[in-house]
């Protein structure tokens, strides 16, 4: 069914594993490009990414802009949020006129969103106010200090 697609997943962390699992469930062939691997730092390997027609970017945040900038002309791109870490790169992304770039914004699949959709079922009346704080509490976990999100040069705004 998807045999004509050349799919690549950039990154091999938690979000990448979720995407890989979905691709396996859909019986899609794909390759994983691991940016931290020494062999993948070579420029010719980045050129090889241009051969794929679908690319999922789930690498560390500070790499997203670079991959988008290099690959958007060649592939459909699905990028985990955020697409960049600074205003200059954001301005440059806004200049790209492509209908082939998509960004993950998955709050619409959260349980609270589903509950809000069902509010009419219970005839509770109008929702007057709602304050939702959503996160994964990485800053509270033991491995946060070793995570790339705690490094100011890679994630200037933190998590």
Where are these regions (language model features)?
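N-terminal Rossmann-like dinucleotide-binding module
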Residues: 1-40
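Hydrophobic anchor at the start of a short beta-strand
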Residues: 7, 29-31, 77, 101, ...
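Alpha-helical elements of Rossmann-like donor-binding domains used by nucleotide-donor carbohydrate transfer enzymes
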Residues: 18, 54, 66, 92, ...
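Short acidic low-complexity segments
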Residues: 39-52
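Local beta-strand N-terminus motif with an aromatic residue
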Residues: 52-55, 74, 124-127
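Beta-strand-loop-alpha-helix segment that lines the small-molecule cofactor/substrate pocket
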Residues: 54, 60, 65-108
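Predominantly a Rossmann-like dinucleotide-binding segment in NAD(P)-dependent oxidoreductases
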Residues: 110-159
């Amino acid at each position: 069914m998807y045999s004509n697609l050349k799919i690549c997943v950039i990154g091999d962390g938690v979000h990448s594993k979720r995407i890989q699992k979905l691709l396996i469930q859909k019986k899609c062939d794909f390759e994983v490009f691991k940016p931290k691997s020494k062999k993948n730092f070579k420029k010719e390997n980045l050129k090889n990414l241009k051969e794929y027609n679908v690319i999922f970017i789930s690498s560390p945040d500070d790499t997203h802009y670079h991959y988008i900038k290099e690959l958007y002309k060649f592939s459909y791109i699905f990028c985990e949020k955020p697409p960049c870490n600074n205003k200059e790169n954001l301005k440059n992304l806004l200049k790209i006129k492509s209908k082939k770039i998509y960004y993950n914004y998955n709050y619409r699949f959260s349980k609270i969103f589903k509950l809000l959709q069902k509010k009419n079922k219970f005839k509770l009346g109008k929702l007057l106010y709602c304050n939702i704080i959503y996160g994964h509490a990485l800053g509270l976990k033991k491995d946060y200090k070793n995570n790339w999100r705690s490094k100011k040069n890679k994630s200037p705004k933190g998590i």
